């Protein structure tokens, strides 16, 4: 991580120096370096998390619009294909043409669903599980790609950060409140 590298660099340079011997300007510079390193780490983590949840979003964040669009389209295709396939593998009397879900009493809908065995639902459930697995693999690939993109953009100077000396805890609202992404 960027923060660990910055800390290692600091400790290798100032092993013999006492903390009290540092001037306020030097402390401010160190705090700025740490804040930039922390922002870099958070940017990479956020890119990866966004791409894992919605493949392509981390790529968009890193201005790789072609890969982002391709991964987002692949994700939408996997989700749509999985849902459509699972629907058509349901027993025929549960489909929308046979059962009006908006105007039929709940007890009748429940009775119809309970009239089938587990084996009747197995093909649909297997397709849902397979689609979920494919979506997870796609999210993992996209997350890894977005993390590499973020690191490359940081190293090439395409993404820059300014020192922020007000280092708040994760989430930033103090008193234990906050948000994470």
Q: Where do the PLM segments sit?
A:
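Transmembrane beta-barrel outer-membrane domains
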Residues: 41, 48-50, 121-125, 168-170
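Short hydrophobic alpha-helical membrane-entry/anchor segments
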Residues: 58-66, 80-94, 133-154
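Hydrophobic alpha-helical transmembrane segments
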Residues: 67, 116-129
